[in-house]
From Swiss-Prot:
This is Bifunctional protein GlmU. Keywords: Acyltransferase, Cell shape, Cell wall biogenesis/degradation, Cytoplasm, Magnesium, Metal-binding, Multifunctional enzyme, Nucleotidyltransferase, Peptidoglycan synthesis, Repeat, Transferase. Catalyzes the last two sequential reactions in the de novo biosynthetic pathway for UDP-N-acetylglucosamine (UDP-GlcNAc). The C-terminal domain catalyzes the transfer of acetyl group from acetyl coenzyme A to glucosamine-1-phosphate (GlcN-1-P) to produce N-acetylglucosamine-1-phosphate (GlcNAc-1-P), which is converted into UDP-GlcNAc by the transfer of uridine 5-monophosphate (from uridine 5-triphosphate), a reaction catalyzed by the N-terminal domain. Pathway: Nucleotide-sugar biosynthesis; UDP-N-acetyl-alpha-D-glucosamine biosynthesis; N-acetyl-alpha-D-glucosamine 1-phosphate from alpha-D-glucosamine 6-phosphate (route II): step 2/2; Nucleotide-sugar biosynthesis; UDP-N-acetyl-alpha-D-glucosamine biosynthesis; UDP-N-acetyl-alpha-D-glucosamine from N-acetyl-alpha-D-glucosamine 1-phosphate: step 1/1; Bacterial outer membrane biogenesis; LPS lipid A biosynthesis. Signal peptide: none annotated. The gene is glmU. Its main location: cytoplasm. Its EC number is 2.7.7.23, 2.3.1.157. It comes from the Bacteria. Mg(2+) binds at residues 105, 227. The keyword Nucleus does not apply. It comes from Haemophilus influenzae (strain 86-028NP). One of its GO terms (biological process) is lipid A biosynthetic process. The active site is at 363 (proton acceptor).
Amino acid sequence: MTKKALSAVILAAGKGTRMYSDLPKVLHTIAGKPMVKHVIDIAHQLGSENIHLIYGHGGDLMRTHLANEQVNWVLQTEQLGTAHAVQQAAPFFKDNENIVVLYGDAPLITKETLEKLIEAKPENGIALLTVNLDNPTGYGRIIRENGNVVAIVEQKDANAEQLNIKEVNTGVMVSDGASFKKWLARVGNNNAQGEYYLTDLIALANQDNCQVVAVQATDVMEVEGANNRLQLAALERYFQNKQASKLLLEGVMIYDPARFDLRGTLEHGKDVEIDVNVIIEGNVKLGDCVKIGAGCVLKNVVIGNDVEIKPYSVLEDSIVGEKAAIGPFSRLRPGAELAAETHVGNFVEIKKSTVGKGSKVNHLTYVGDSEIGSNCNIGAGVITCNYDGANKFKTIIGDDVFVGSDTQLVAPVKVANGATIGAGTTITRDVGENELVITRVAQRHIQGWQRPIKKK
């Protein structure tokens, strides 16, 4: 049988009053990514031809934050219920395609669960995603006959027997475009809230003798939404623990999974060790035998084999060669490239610069817009003065150069191979090969010096 085309509808128009935020609810993040972006990504993974994003509150913010997303923006000017929301997208539905309804504030739904749901959809019927809850209070109960779903009964309308049912509605469903359009047109708002509910489609399908089947989510957290920051934090921690568990099973040693955050993707080699309170953002690649100390932040970096990153170092958009040592308290800013066996120590900042093989920048140093050759030693307190208040200039240092402590290199300037720069020197002109340069004033000794006396 030919597989039907698929489109997705994502409900994301709610304000999220209980977040106490100017940001629309679905833009609050899980693992550094807006909740609704997680759902959009899943819809793409399912192979959705069209993704209809229903938006309302904070529309300008939604469009700004999701400007690069390939979605059909569908405005719901008034929030009049879930069926009303889907109805806004109905004119775009093709009769013979499947439509899956998802929720922008339920970010942990998985591709596998949705594939099972789509596979289970009966011809001209509905497949409904349900879940069993130990405490189903407040949720619509699933009423079955001969295995099929015949109704969803809300808490306030349920009798004593129905209240004992543990299976509840999640709101996620699949049907074909023609059926959705037919049933949505018949949904009324004769209820206390005066809203149009998607759950009414179950009764309408049964009236038309169309089958409604339920597929149960195996993990309740897949369908949990976040209406406040407490629930958001719970989803965040669940998701992070899930990611940490996967990495542990792949051989990554995470010392404490409860104190690890992955806010992007991590590609890793063997025998990687990650200490507590490490944050990984964007796309990070770690080689074999990499050790990351406590409190480090890595964002969009490539780290070679046998690298040690000591505690509280921050690396962003950088490349580190094998057997390098970084930190503690080092900062690699965008464009930093360290070759193999380099050392970058405490309170060193490197930006848009290359450091050659075996070179050391160990203490209290700023290196910006620079090229440092191999086997150099850059002393404590060295500054590359790369900015004149309007433009940036380069410092180029050759191989086997020794730069003494408290040296300023005023760019643009070049230091040739083998040069030695004495401590306390200010370099304003190019330095030749194997030269020694010292610019500090001669030391004076004044005998019998009397310190000033404090006036009373």
